[in-house]
């Protein structure tokens, strides 16, 4: 087998790593829908899904079967091509955003030097999917939900990017592995506390999760921009939202909590435990907080998050200048 040169083996191993990591992310996103319902039941002192399988363990399988066999309906007056492309773009952009996250020192799909910029680009690409879905559905509620979602996402992406600039300045790199290695002695959550708070808030908003789920507000917009979707097209939006939660949780761990670093246990175990903790925090936030009005969400972003990110940047710049001068 002369074609198995070291370069070919390296390429095959890289492809295998990418497939394994992305399959695990998709599985986590799918399983989180079941885990969320069980945890919400626990938080609200009621039963979660407990009928299919032992203790409801097969509920996810039942949901997948139902979704596969539902009619894949397309509205009569919709733009069929864009209507079909929108969920694919949403799912793919959220999945690709995880590609830059180093799960361990050797396991990362794409160790890019512009890792953070790539994440921001993928987050921005998701806005197009939402706009495509709302406009192509030819439904006023879908369009209103898409307009809300695009305005909210674009606004909070400003704070998302600014909250990361302090981390980039401290590490001197946009590369995620370099940022993790820079936290060997002190996690970024301590010197970049305001950046962490703002990034976590903006991450919830960009994922359109409660309490920032106004684009999908059932009481006002009848489920928003994916009201006309059914079957696997709706499934791509549904699983994509949970993949977004997994990705944002993994980024919080990587950027502010030392990534895979920790004593005794293997690196990927530490990474998985930290990520699972923040995924549970997403669910706890949904269980604990009410949904504010849309104007309150936008006002909170520009009047609270933006000043916090600017203060964080100024303090970080001052500290770096002081350390350089010393």
From Swiss-Prot:
TM spans (from-to): 11-31, 81-101, 114-134, 154-174, 186-206, 237-257, 265-285, 302-322
Keyword vocabulary terms for this entry: Cell inner membrane, Cell membrane, Membrane, NAD, Quinone, Translocase, Transmembrane, Transmembrane helix, Ubiquinone
MF terms in GO: NADH dehydrogenase activity; oxidoreductase activity, acting on NAD(P)H, quinone or similar compound as acceptor; quinone binding
Any single Pfam family the record assigns to this protein: NADHdh
Membrane-topology annotation of the record: Multi-pass membrane protein
GO cellular component, one term: plasma membrane
Localization per record: Cell inner membrane
Catalytic activity: a quinone + NADH + 5 H(+)(in) = a quinol + NAD(+) + 4 H(+)(out)
InterPro entries: NADH_UbQ_OxRdtase_su1/FPO, NADH_UbQ_OxRdtase_su1_CS
Group of enzyme by EC: translocase
GO biological process: aerobic respiration
Major localisation: membrane
Keyword Cell membrane on entry: yes
EC number(s) from the headed UniProt entry: 7.1.1.-
Function text: NDH-1 shuttles electrons from NADH, via FMN and iron-sulfur (Fe-S) centers, to quinones in the respiratory chain. The immediate electron acceptor for the enzyme in this species is believed to be ubiquinone. Couples the redox reaction to proton translocation (for every two electrons transferred, four hydrogen ions are translocated across the cytoplasmic membrane), and thus conserves the redox energy in a proton gradient. This subunit may bind ubiquinone.
Family designation: Belongs to the complex I subunit 1 family.
UniProt-listed HAMAP family: NDH1_NuoH (MF_01350)
Subunit structure: NDH-1 is composed of 13 different subunits. Subunits NuoA, H, J, K, L, M, N constitute the membrane sector of the complex.
Name the UniProt record assigns to this protein: NADH-quinone oxidoreductase subunit H
Originating species: Cronobacter sakazakii (strain ATCC BAA-894)
């Amino acid at each position: 087998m002369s074609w198995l040169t070291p370069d070919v083996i390296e390429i095959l191993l890289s492809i295998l790593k990418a497939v394994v990591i992305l399959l695990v992310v998709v599985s986590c996103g799918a399983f989180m829908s079941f885990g969320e319902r069980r945890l919400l039941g626990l938080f609200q002192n009621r039963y979660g899904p407990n009928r299919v399988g032992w203790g409801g363990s097969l509920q996810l399988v039942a949901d997948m079967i139902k979704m596969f066999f539902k009619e894949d309906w397309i509205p009569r007056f919709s733009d069929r091509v864009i209507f079909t492309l929108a969920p694919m773009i949403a799912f793919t952009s959220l999945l690709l955003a995880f590609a830059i996250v180093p799960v361990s020192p050797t396991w990362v799909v794409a160790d890019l030097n512009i890792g953070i910029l790539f994440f921001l680009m993928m987050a921005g690409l998701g806005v197009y999917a939402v706009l495509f879905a709302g406009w192509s559905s030819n439904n006023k509620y879908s369009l209103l939900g898409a307009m809300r979602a695009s305005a909210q996402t674009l606004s909070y992406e400003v704070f998302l990017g600014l909250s990361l600039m302090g981390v980039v300045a401290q590490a001197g790199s946009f590369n995620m592995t370099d940022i993790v290695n820079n936290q060997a002695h002190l996690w970024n959550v301590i010197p970049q506390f305001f950046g962490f708070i703002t990034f976590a808030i903006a991450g919830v908003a960009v994922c359109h999760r409660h309490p920032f789920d106004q684009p999908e507000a059932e009481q006002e917009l009848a489920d928003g921009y994916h009201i006309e979707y059914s079957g696997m097209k709706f499934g791509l939006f549904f699983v994509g939202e949970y993949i977004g939660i997994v990705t944002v949780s993994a980024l919080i761990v990587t950027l502010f909590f030392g990534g895979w670093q920790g004593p005794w246990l293997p690196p990927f175990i530490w990474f998985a435990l930290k990520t699972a903790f923040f995924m549970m925090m997403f669910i706890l936030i949904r269980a604990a907080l009410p949904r504010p009005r849309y104007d309150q969400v936008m006002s909170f972003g520009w009047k609270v998050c933006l000043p916090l990110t600017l203060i964080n940047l100024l303090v970080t710049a001052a500290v770096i200048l002081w350390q350089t001068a010393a």
